[in-house]
């Protein structure tokens, strides 16, 4: 049931289940375009305002706006009902996750794989990893929560609060970690990208919800209106990835092994963060239907935002952009494994 007690039977859909395959297809299509028709990504790359690619901005709004529609910020009123689970989520997402991502990615990219990745490339890949680690997941959390039989009302609160919290610490955390990595980031561009790709879609989603619910009712909004946008996020993401891979053709063809190497620290990070939040929930006596979503929301990433910001900061041709797309490539299969782990350990938690 949802936060109002209505039953929902939403699981992972066709696009979500095979997202890794779609990303591979996007990679192939993008590389073919970049190799045979390089004028296309070059022309699209020139359509920009203040360093922001107009085609990419449109695609990212198509990705993020439907996600914001699904979040009911009225649920924040329920924060005080069971705050321990929320504190676990917040601490994991904002005080642990960004810094473990930085540490793990640095270890692998600069030490373990130093014989395979040049330092200047490793720095760019690290920047992409940092952007992935600094933003907890939004839309896909509802899928993971459903697959682990999580408490839907509590999951909504977890997502809603994180979507609001992201407005404050995301910019300084990214600025700090990229600064430590010796990556120069214009503070204004970083702040503007959050306004453009988080605040505007968030406000648009909230206003749309208010208007539609007022005129058509909550039932129509949740059962009909929202589902009109079901595939918009996926289509927007896949088209964005095609453009990125088209711009990354030479890097991919000259360093195909790098995609595998980048995937290693991202996978380690995902598993580690899941178990940190999951174990903390166990220690503090949370029920499984709160513990599982708590682990999932930290383990998965708001990769749509990461892709948006990395393009705004470094462009589609940067190696940092390639690192964020590898995050998209690896997330679904890893998260499906963690879903199985969560479901098989349900007996560890109180009912």
Regions found by a protein language model. Name each.
Residues 1-69, 74-299, 303-351:
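Alpha-helical transmembrane segments of multi-pass small-molecule/ion transporters
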């Amino acid at each position: 049931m949802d936060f109002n007690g209505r039953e929902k039977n939403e699981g992972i859909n066709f696009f979500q289940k095979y997202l890794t395959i779609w990303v591979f297809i996007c990679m192939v299509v993008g590389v073919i375009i970049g190799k045979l028709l390089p004028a296309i990504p070059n022309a699209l790359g020139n359509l920009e305002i203040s360093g922001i690619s107009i085609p990419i901005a449109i695609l990212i709004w198509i990705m993020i706006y439907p996600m914001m529609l699904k979040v009911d910020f009225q649920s924040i009123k329920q924060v005080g009902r069971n705050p321990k689970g929320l504190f676990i989520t917040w601490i994991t997402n904002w005080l642990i996750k960004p810094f473990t991502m930085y540490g793990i990615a640095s270890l692998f990219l600069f030490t373990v794989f130093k014989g395979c990745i040049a330092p200047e490339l490793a720095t760019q890949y690290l920047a992409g990893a940092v952007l992935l680690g600094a933003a907890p997941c939004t839309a896909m959390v509802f899928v993971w929560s459903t697959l682990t039989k999580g408490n839907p009302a509590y999951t909504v609160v977890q997502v809603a609060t994180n979507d609001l919290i992201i407005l404050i610490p995301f910019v300084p955390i990214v600025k700090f970690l990229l600064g430590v990595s010796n990556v120069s980031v214009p503070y204004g561009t970083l702040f503007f990208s959050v306004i453009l790709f988080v605040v505007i879609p968030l406000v648009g989603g909230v206003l749309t919800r208010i208007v539609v619910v007022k005129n058509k009712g909550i039932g129509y909004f949740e059962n009909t209106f929202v589902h009109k946008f079901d595939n918009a996020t996926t289509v927007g993401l896949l088209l964005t990835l095609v453009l990125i891979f088209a711009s990354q053709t030479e890097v991919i063809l000259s360093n195909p092994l790098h995609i595998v190497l980048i995937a290693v620290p991202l996978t380690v990070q995902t598993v580690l963060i899941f178990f940190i939040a999951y174990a903390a929930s166990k220690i503090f006596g949370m029920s499984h239907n709160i513990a599982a979503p708590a682990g999932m929301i930290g383990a998965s990433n708001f990769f749509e935002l990461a892709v948006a910001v990395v393009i705004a900061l470094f462009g589609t041709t940067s190696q940092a952009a390639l690192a964020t797309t590898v995050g998209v490539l690896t997330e679904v299969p890893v998260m499906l494994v963690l879903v199985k782990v969560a479901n098989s350990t349900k007996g560890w938690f109180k009912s």
